Regions:
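Conserved GNAT acetyl-CoA-binding A-motif
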Residues: 96-110, 117-122
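Short, basic/aromatic recognition patches
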Residues: 29-35
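A short helix-loop-beta-strand connector motif used in the catalytic cores of GNAT acetyltransferases and
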Residues: 35-47
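Short amphipathic alpha-helix that is part of the acyltransferase structural core
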Residues: 1-29, 126
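Structured beta->alpha junctions
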Residues: 5, 74-77
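Conserved acetyl-CoA-binding loop-helix of GNAT-fold acetyltransferases
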Residues: 75, 81-94
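Conserved beta-strand in the GNAT
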Residues: 47, 53-62, 69, 74
Length: 127
């Protein structure tokens, strides 16, 4: 289930974001990123929780009145290749698509398009 980030999950969120290439375990950069999610109303961090375990993080930035950009997608290494990343991307698209055009940073663009391809294949299979 996708939940909004809360301050009491800061260490878990920082750990997940540290797997992003731009963050790469740079503690000061991670702290700045988390602070931005906590203080900037246009930055939204969501966590993926199953049972009592946070397994992933996805962060978006509202660029303007029409665009939201997915800028962070990270899954705990022990839960990778289980569909969590794809599920988070698709959930965020569902959350924001009625109000914004959803896109990504260059860093995660390929992953985003793979998620869309898998979703399209699933929809076609259901027809």
């Amino acid at each position: 289930m996708l939940i909004r980030y809360k301050k009491n999950l800061e260490k878990i969120a920082m750990g997940l974001l540290s797997f992003m290439p731009d963050e790469k375990k740079d503690v000061k950069k991670l702290q700045q990123t988390i602070k931005e999610y906590e203080t900037n109303d246009n930055w939204h961090l969501h966590l993926w929780k199953e049972e009592d375990d946070v397994r992933g993080a996805i962060g978006v930035r509202i660029e303007d009145e029409l665009h939201v950009i997915i800028q962070h997608v990270s899954v705990n290494p022990s839960h990778r290749n289980t569909g969590i990343g794809r599920t988070m991307v698709n959930e965020v698209k569902r959350l924001y698509q009625n109000k914004y055009a959803v896109s990504t940073t260059d860093e995660i663009e390929d992953f985003y398009h793979k998620c869309a391809e898998v979703e399209d294949t699933t929809i076609d299979a259901d027809d």
